């Protein structure tokens, strides 16, 4: 069973699903606030989503599963594993343990990027197109050379706006924009920015400490760790740092750690190695 990251939907796994389906019966769900699932801001927390996943496994699959969660989906998967006996194998794909909770969250890429953009979008009235708003205001513009940044930004936003006008129901495509970055727009058409607001306010975690979640996991576990760095102004450019990873492994002493030389979307950027590791862990 696959649980996607925030901002995208279950289709974000389409690149790896055909090969996984050769050895698994694959289930991929849309979390609340994403895709075709319920859009109700009161449900945008790890408890309500986690319990919905537990209910789905109990009533639809009717037996324990191998559960894989990417990013925030990994936090949800950890909740399921720690609050039920329905998880046989747990695979955590670069989830933001410790870094996304409490005051720490304010110094992470997700906070200065998606969370803050969601918050600002919800407080303005000029546009209702969140996809274009996010593209226009994303933190990634800071990575462009300062001298040419605004010129490039203006041109790219113009191309994105034309695409959105002609193809409002399609996933965003912008010429020259990296494919790995565009993968983050998969399903954003049906993303509720109030979900990002839950990470902005820290309400997503419903008061449950990450260490508490991890220490109550007793099934086989594998952690997939992507690259991370820290910017000159102290922003964690990645899901979690080495200190956070150390805390994860302390709480899960029998966890298998696999490192990937890529960005946050491991199943997108390193799909072959991702599939290989999942099959080895079976």
How should each PLM-predicted stretch be described?
Residues 215-261:
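Conserved loop-alpha-helix segment in the C-terminal half of the alpha/beta-hydrolase fold
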Residues 259-271:
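Catalytic histidine-centered segment of alpha/beta-hydrolase-like enzymes
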Residues 74-85, 90:
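Short glycine-enriched nucleophile-adjacent loop
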Residues 150-212, 228:
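Hydrophobic, aromatic-rich cap/lid helix
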Residues 31-68, 72, 79, 103-109, ...:
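Active-site loop/oxyanion-hole signature of alpha/beta-hydrolase fold enzymes
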Residues 1-39:
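Conserved HGGG/HGGXW glycine-rich cap/lid loop of the alpha/beta-hydrolase fold
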């Amino acid at each position: 069973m696959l649980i996607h990251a925030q901002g995208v939907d279950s289709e974000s796994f389409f690149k790896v699903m055909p090969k996984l389906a050769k050895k698994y019966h694959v289930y991929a769900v849309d979390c609340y606030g994403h895709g075709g699932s319920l859009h109700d801001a009161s449900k945008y927390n790890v408890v309500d989503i986690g319990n919905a996943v537990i209910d789905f496994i109990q009533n639809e699959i009717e037996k324990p599963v191998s559960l894989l969660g990417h990013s925030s989906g990994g936090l949800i998967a950890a909740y399921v594993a720690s609050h039920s006996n329905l998880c046989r194998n747990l695979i955590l794909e670069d989830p933001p343990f410790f870094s996304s909770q409490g005051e720490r969250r304010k110094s992470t890429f997700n906070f200065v990027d998606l969370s803050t953009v969601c918050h600002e979008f919800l407080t303005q009235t000029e546009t209702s197109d969140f996809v274009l708003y996010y593209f226009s205001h994303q933190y990634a513009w800071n990575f462009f050379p300062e001298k040419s940044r605004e010129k490039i930004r203006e041109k790219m936003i113009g191309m994105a706006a034309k695409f959105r006008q002609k193809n409002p129901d399609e996933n965003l495509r912008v010429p020259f924009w990296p494919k790995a970055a565009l993968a983050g727009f998969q399903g954003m058409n049906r993303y509720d920015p109030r979900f990002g607001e839950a990470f902005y306010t820290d309400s997503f975690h419903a008061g449950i400490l990450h260490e508490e979640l991890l220490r109550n996991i007793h099934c086989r576990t594998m952690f997939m760790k992507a690259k991370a760095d820290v910017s000159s102004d102290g922003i964690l450019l990645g899901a979690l740092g080495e200190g956070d990873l150390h805390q994860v492994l302390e709480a899960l002493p029998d966890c298998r750690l696999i490192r990937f030389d890529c960005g946050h979307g491991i199943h997108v950027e390193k799909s072959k190695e991702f599939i290989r590791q999942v099959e080895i862990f079976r």
